[in-house]
Amino acid sequence: MSSKRLSQNEQEKSPGTGPPTHKRRRIGLACNACRMRKSRCDGHRPSCSSCLSLGVNCLYEPGDSTTNVIVRKDYVSDLEQRVASVEHNLQRLNDVLKGHLSPCTGGTDSNNHHNNHDSPCHQPTIAQSITSSRPNTRDKSAANETCATGLEEPDDEDANTNGMAMTFVEEKTSVYYGEASNINFTQLLLRALATVHGATPVAPSASNQASGPGDGVTTDVPQNQHAVSASDLATSESSPTALPSVQEMDSLLDIYFDTAGVVFPFICEDTMRRTYNECRHNGFTRARRTWLGTLNMIFALASCLSSSAKVRFERCNVFYKRAMALCGELSKRVVSLEIVHYLILVVLHCQGTQRSIQAWNNHGLAIRSAMALGLHCQSSGVSLDSAQQEYRRRTWVIIYCLDKVLSTAFGRPASIADEQMHSFNGRESVMGLSPMSLSNPQVPVDLPGDFLSVSFRLYQVMSKSLAEQYGTNLDHVDSGHDDMAPLKASGELRKQLRLWAGSLPGHLHVCQPEDEFLAHNTRGNRLRVILTLRYHNLGILIHKPLLSTTIRHLFQAGNRMEAPPSYMIQLAMAEAHECLRSAQLTIDIVYAVISADPTPENNLGAWYFTLYYVFTASLVVSGRLLWAQHGQSIVDEVAVDHCKSLLSKAEEIFKKLDRKNSLVLSCLEYIARLARICSMKDVPPNHQNGSLDITSDTTNTASGVTDTMPLDEDGMDAFQLFAAEMFDPNIFKGFNLSPVEGVSFTDGIWEGFPCGG
């Protein structure tokens, strides 16, 4: 009894001496586990502390006798916030999609689905259905393919996925072609033809304001021709990381580094093959996304040089789409040397496909990415080894060369000024070996380095021509106060061009059409032919202003053949023959090579660069044909026959270059029609009120592929419009016959017009 009293006294004293205890908080509902254990439950949601410590499921189920459950206020507040957030997101999504989904409500019947496959409302359905079924549509050849996994993603804090699917209306892109472009020169020829035949030039539309000499041409390019279709999705592989078989990859790498890798040596072959072998040995389980995109673009370029046209374009398109899926958006956010290499390869690829606008846009992105890396400043890579510095320099030099090529082809201002290239003028800055390698036979010659070095100096002359003769493709106005200025500029640039040709090393000398080595396919011979074609193409560019001046003078409206030309015009006429000479040598050299070996393994290199050179030369010959036929009171029969002979060779070149290529065939058709209308001798008797019908003229064309080329009631106006908007496929509707037998032309044929080399 005494012990119990002592314990009670201690308990009564303890509250006064110890810290005060907290009052136990009652909860309205305990979880099932705590009720079964009859232990204390703190009521935390979604799991109480006891269940968390024991690792059991915590469930709150009110009993049958429970009528009033007490829920914590913070839990209810959290639920209210989550519901409000969901409602807010749903309202935003409803506002965004309200305007896009409303036009699609009336076209849900089965007939519309079958008849309107190209409509904006139908495309998302196709894309979603095919995308969901693509893993099951791969062909049997995919069994031999490899799929890269474990891609190393570059750090990008802005890479957030936008999950909304939208349907956009059709848009058109207005593109400008300045004075240096082939399209602008063609406009001059057609204005002269309109003067000869008395046709009234078509009134320029909103998209074409080329009314005066030297003006640019602005055309509208419809963009729906490259929209995603069912066939495109079906031909593309299920994953952008898919790769062909090892044997095919090895073959494509060999083709690239033996062809395009020699002409554009900005990717180190040893480094690329070393990385490729490492990825191949680990089964491509770990690879950089940028490197894999660059590899696919290498495969695309190599596939473009294969023998079969059908296989070439199918495989090339597959590799291009994979590369775009890997690096298309990434190239706009990440800057690295591999991204710059990827963009250069995209530019080269787009020049040979129906993506000329993408070539120009990606080229601008490549320049800015290269400048962000400091490739334009040689001091930025002083901490790197000599090989890395060399390929950084080569990358920037190739970007400079492409800048001048595209500026000439599109007639637009160049992006890289010559002042930014002073530190690259030295020969050793773009060569991998010492200059002594040329004189010492014991030292192997760096053929790609030599070729890039001399090409760089050639394009510097081209840059001077663009600045002095074309006003850098800005609003160039002829210097009326000095009639000798064009002659002086042409003579000085021709002198520089010949000095460049005289300074070439022995293994890269300019070749002639009668040289026997043109039939022997070697890497050195191929580079000599390519360099010679570039040389004569620049000769055309230098002397084309004088040819344009001659044509402009001879075919002035109301002032034709009334008085002898002035002394300055006579000098311009004499110098204009140099333009024809360069065009003739271009056609003769290509004709000699392709006659000896019409396969892609000949000495011409990439077919689309050859196409550009021959097409440019054919336009010049057509201008000389117009001059000889209609520019004087007496027809120059010798010159007419000579021009027809050259155009006949050009036709054979187009046919042997690639018979199944729509881009080549479109060039053949265009030159055939232009030669046909330039060689017409008399104005047809049924020409009335500015309308020209040339069906009554049965004169053969210069190339012999057309007997008649009937136009509709618009006559000459339709043909002039055809050249003014070369990229619009609807212009073909103005002609009743195609001068190429057995050829059907499809939409989008002009969007990929040859754009330089």
Curated annotation (Swiss-Prot):
Upregulating conditions: Expression is induced in response to 2-benzoxasolinone (BOA) exposure. Expression is also induced in response to 6-methoxy-2-benzoxazolinone (MBOA) and 2-aminophenol (2-AP) treatment.
UniProt-listed CDD domains: fungal_TF_MHR, GAL4
Skewed-composition ranges (Basic and acidic residues): 111-120
GO molecular-function terms, A-Z: DNA-binding transcription factor activity, RNA polymerase II-specific; RNA polymerase II cis-regulatory region sequence-specific DNA binding; zinc ion binding
Disruption-associated phenotype: Reduces significantly the induction of the FBD cluster genes in response to 6-methoxy-2-benzoxazolinone (MBOA) treatment. Impairs the degradation of MBOA but does not affect the degradation of BOA and 2-aminophenol (2-AP).
Matches recorded under Pfam families: Fungal_trans, Zn_clus
GO annotation, cellular component aspect: nucleus
A GO BP entry: DNA-templated transcription
InterPro entries with a match to the protein in the record: Fungal_SecMet_Regulators, Transcription_factor_dom_fun, Zn2-C6_fun-type_DNA-bd_sf, Zn2Cys6_DnaBD
Polar residues composition-biased segments: 125-135
Spans annotated as Disordered: 1-24, 106-161, 202-222
Subcellular location: Nucleus
Keywords, in A-Z order: DNA-binding, Metal-binding, Nucleus, Transcription, Transcription regulation, Zinc
Presence of keyword DNA-binding: yes
DNA-binding region: 31-58
Keyword Nucleotide-binding annotated: no
SUPFAM superfamilies found in the cross-reference section: Zn2/Cys6 DNA-binding domain
Signal peptide region: none
Function: Transcription factor; part of the Fusarium detoxification of benzoxazolinone cluster involved in the degradation of benzoxazolinones produced by the host plant. Maize, wheat, and rye produce the 2 benzoxazinone phytoanticipins 2,4-dihy-droxy-7-methoxy-1,4-benzoxazin-3-one (DIMBOA) and 2,4-dihydroxy-1,4-benzoxazin-3-one (DIBOA) that, due to their inherent instability once released, spontaneously degrade to the more stable corresponding benzoxazolinones, 6-methoxy-2-benzoxazolinone (MBOA) and 2-benzoxazolinone (BOA), respectively.
Name this protein carries in UniProt: Transcription factor FBD3
Organism: Fusarium pseudograminearum (strain CS3096)
Taxonomic placement: Eukaryota, Fungi, Dikarya, Ascomycota, Pezizomycotina
